[in-house]
Amino acid sequence: MFEKIAIIGGSGNVGSHIAFLGAMRHIAKEILLFSNDIPRCKGVGLDISQAAAIFDIPILIKGCNSYEEIAESEVVIITAGFPRTPNMTRNDLLLKNASIIQEISSNVARIAPQSLLIVVSNPLDAMCLVAKQWSKFEKERVIGMAGILDSARLTYESKVMLGDFNKHIQSYVIGSHSDDMLPLLRHCLCEGKVFTDIFTPKMQEELIKETKGGGAKIVNYYQKGSAYFAPASGVIKILEAISTLNEEILVCSVFTEGEYGIKDIYLGLPIKLGKKGVEHIVELPLNQQEQEMLNISTQGIKEQVEILKDNKLLY
């Protein structure tokens, strides 16, 4: 259990659901909700506090709009930013959200210099690099939540296709948090059997299509905003892995230094987490086609990085 965590963007859909799930699972003794919309932020904090009281969970949840109050937070979760709307690509969000992440990261480094940073804002992989550079934190302490979500969508779609929600499934979707994500069907398991032995080639194509379209489908249903229950759950999964040292392999956006032949960008890869953040990146054996697809997956991120450099949001 953490002593204190802070959620920047705590009044938004993702931030408030992280707080609610975190309270219900008693992830911390104190959860701080930071937002410019202080009335809503305080309302969310009070509402969740009353929910926690129903289950007699001893937790302090409060809203604030001063960075000074995030001092001594062990983890700071960044959900702030503009959400995707119908027909909006992640690139459309790039410059809009990068300036927000720049400001937040600089303030977190000033007020909570020992914290871990978990980034949820999109475009995820590029925002992680912005957060790392402007916080000046070690690469292990800046983690992006996306691969857990993409992998969960593959797990869900495979259960739908099998018509059996009782199956134990382990899925890995690596690469960028975009349409270029790479579901590693050869490494995904259902009751110990690999997906490529269970699903026909046509079924595999359908699984990949549905997984990649999972987020956009929710955006189209909601019309205003994007997914928040599942992303919030992904953050809690990271927090629990850090606090319990459960050794579970999770796909998160992490800084690369040659792993999988990729350097100097954030990318969704399998990792193990510990008290100090990323302990190590797990390198699954890829065949030539998978490696080529992973390389393609990095191109969009690299293009975003160049755009951010041109606009002085990265250096």
Curated annotation (Swiss-Prot):
The active site is at H177. NAD(+) binds at G9, G10, S11, G12, N13, V14, G15, N97, V120, S121, N122. Its EC number is 1.1.1.37. Gene3D superfamilies: Lactate dehydrogenase/glycoside hydrolase, family 4, C-terminal, NAD(P)-binding Rossmann-like Domain. Keywords: NAD, Oxidoreductase, Tricarboxylic acid cycle. Substrate binds at R84, R90, N122, R153. It catalyses: (S)-malate + NAD(+) = oxaloacetate + NADH + H(+). The keyword Nucleotidyltransferase does not apply. Pfam families: Ldh_1_C, Ldh_1_N. One of its GO terms (biological process) is tricarboxylic acid cycle. It is an enzyme of class 1 (oxidoreductase). Transmembrane segments: none annotated. GO terms for molecular function: L-lactate dehydrogenase activity; L-malate dehydrogenase (NAD+) activity. InterPro entries: L-lactate/malate_DH (IPR001557), Lactate/malate_DH_C (IPR022383), Lactate/malate_DH_N (IPR001236), Lactate_DH/Glyco_Ohase_4_C (IPR015955), Malate_DH_type3 (IPR011275), NAD(P)-bd_dom_sf (IPR036291). Catalyzes the reversible oxidation of malate to oxaloacetate. Belongs to the LDH/MDH superfamily. This is Malate dehydrogenase.
